[in-house]
């Protein structure tokens, strides 16, 4: 690290001159595995037992997956902050791996850094996820003899909308990886790190609803709510825990994920999606405990199993985290407040290891000065009973950024034992309303987050007249060879059609994707007569005389039967994307005679599969009596391969049995009229 020239008062991050991402750390080579385990276990576990645990790393080549994940995370935060004009460095310091926390702090101090903002890789407030990090920063400062550096900490970020969105989208993507299953036979199990009951009792900010369990339940409810909002439904969900450690006699949060998975078949569950909302990245606990052990338990229980991704470096999550960092800096300058309900610095007494634990020095807290701790911290180590490994449930079996590797004294409380441990954590929405009566791979309207898009009011769209025409042509005679002449021909024809009052959503180059068609023009209007006028004008234009019609159809938006808030993307404020695929379809006669509940169930499954691909935008319009089809559908996306993926995935749903016709397809790239003409045959 070179001398820091960025500690300028004009930097958006002033008064901070560095951001320090603090993570758990892990071995970066096979040679580091045993030293890492000795460090994590504090010498309390025999060497032969550590050797057994070390074998967990063999399947990863002796390298913890946390390292790559954290490195990418640090880079993502740095890049996002630079977009906001931040020039101060974003660095990494690990508690148990290189680069070590003390080394990072010492290096920063040597280069003149005196005020640091720390971001820990834990979204939730508890001793192991918050206070322990603050204590270890203070201890590292004391060990290094640094007494003139202030380290503040970003508050827990589980409330961040981007964190919720990242987990919701990961969950919807995961639905695509399980076989088609009735909603009532599908279960979502949200998973987080288990902690001792005594740590749960002392977690949070001391206010009702801020404890560890309540934080997770709130996130589960918000993630489930977003999934339900996207396509109108959400399977029943539970909250379970992984990575329990310590003495078997000490109570920890339950149910354990393995035990819970084994209980699901007797509840009629056939498919399960495990969503690790308690973790920010794919580290050892996620990959080993869920991808291997939980997956094996599910297989043994006859369950179809998949695991959703962690939030990782999802763009919305990183953007919100950068916003929290900038907000903290503004608050430190006296220019604003925090963007979350969590106090910064932490309130006195929050997130102790257990309710009566004696505080030791910690940075960024109301009960201890937010400066380097005194020299007496050097020998301070949390006390407690000797660590007793419990089979494969040892804390060092699953090291990760939120691992609880320190033993916990017995809780002074008597935790309530429940006959149904999931009763406090299960969604009440076991009966889910179905989505709309069409083939749209997206559901209820949500305000757009892409800057290209604009919000609309669904009720106004449903109350208005919204029409579209899709007209396909082939080049019958060569276009002019001279560039200016060809450009005038095309631009004049487009302008002449536009004088009808129509809006042109796009020109699409079909060449090569079909042998008999070269152009599709997508027009939209509030009046079908305007669409007809535009078509007549285009056919009579100079360009029109070079073209022959291949296919043309009209559709109109009608409020959906099962989900009135579903809107076609073309009328929902969604900007056109680079690629589009257009096709008609006709349902079978049997479809319309099915009970509404059956159609709703099948469309609900269809919606779960399709809505997981939120990057592909769908516009389904009714075409009854307007031509030979019942529906006209357009799929738009920035990546043509993603449109292919969506169409393939939708072949596996039950509603597909009730489709008689779903061709022809017209697929092409959206281009300007001039670009399209430049690509065509010339005289």
Curated annotation (Swiss-Prot):
**Name of the protein this chain belongs to:** Coproporphyrin-dependent heme b biosynthesis bifunctional protein
Listed GO cellular component terms?
Answer: cytoplasm
Q: How is the cofactor bound?
A: Fe-coproporphyrin III acts both as a substrate and a redox cofactor.
Q: Where is this region: Coproporphyrin III ferrochelatase?
A: 1-330
Top-rank lineage group of the source organism: Bacteria
Cite a single GO MF annotation. Answer: oxidoreductase activity
Q: What does this protein do?
A: Involved in coproporphyrin-dependent heme b biosynthesis. Catalyzes the insertion of ferrous iron into coproporphyrin III to form coproheme III. Also catalyzes the decarboxylation of coproheme III to heme b (protoheme IX), the last step of the pathway.
Annotated region (Disordered) at: 382-456
What's the catalysed reaction? Fe-coproporphyrin III + 2 H(+) = coproporphyrin III + Fe(2+); Fe-coproporphyrin III + 2 H2O2 + 2 H(+) = heme b + 2 CO2 + 4 H2O; Fe-coproporphyrin III + H2O2 + H(+) = harderoheme III + CO2 + 2 H2O; harderoheme III + H2O2 + H(+) = heme b + CO2 + 2 H2O
